[in-house]
Amino acid sequence: MSVPVPNLRGLNPAPVTPFTPDGQIDFPAIERLGSWLGTFPEVTSLVVLGHAGEGTFLTQSEQVAVIEAFVASTAGRVPVVAGITGEGTKVAVEEAQRAVDAGATAGLIYPSHGWLRFGFQPGAPQDRYRAIYEETGLNEILFQYPDNTKCSYDLDTQLEIAALPGVHYTKNGVRNMKRWDTEIPVLRQAFPELTIMSCHDEYLLHTLVRSEERRVGKECRS
């Protein structure tokens, strides 16, 4: 069963997961942070459990609780995007299903972090995205990692992932403006409806000025 496709054309802040001094999740702080971000009309989603949200440091039950808390912070009005970080495909599918059940409407699909050092077999990323959508219906964001890692997708891989059902967005953090300037136009031409999001700190102006669309996912602290 597919999840309704949210329009993420706007600002997509990535709030941190706040903690109490004794290391517990600070749910009142989540309510304050999420409800405040939800007051801005430019904010089209809250991206949780990514790098800023420390999703990989949380237990499964904590991940679910964080998603539910951010959904509740805006009474479901602002879509919640959940980072999907599980290493194996089956693990990622199960994580994505928990995210759907908790109220997430899209997933930021991380590459398997085992690929960071050793790279990936051809077709493995495509299988990851395909399985997640086919088994959970979660809308997917193609996550392009920095160029200096071994899990940065070549253009052909990006095009093949973007062509898959359920992939409606790409968050690009390639951090190589030669690749941005040559690959983004190809993606845009091949998939005019693909929402292109920049997460470049050091190249933010470049990626906004040269993009027809103004979208960015940034860390947000309470």
Task: Give residue spans per PLM region.
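Active-site beta->alpha loop and helix N-cap motifs at the rims of alpha/beta catalytic domains
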Residues: S2-S152
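Residues that line or immediately flank small-molecule/substrate-binding pockets and catalytic motifs
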Residues: P15, G50, P111, V174, ...
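Active-site/binding-pocket entry motifs
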Residues: T17-P18, Y203, S222
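Ligand/cofactor pocket segment of small-molecule handling proteins
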Residues: A106, G114-G119, P125-R210
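Conserved small/polar residues in nucleotide/adenosyl-binding loops
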Residues: E213-C220
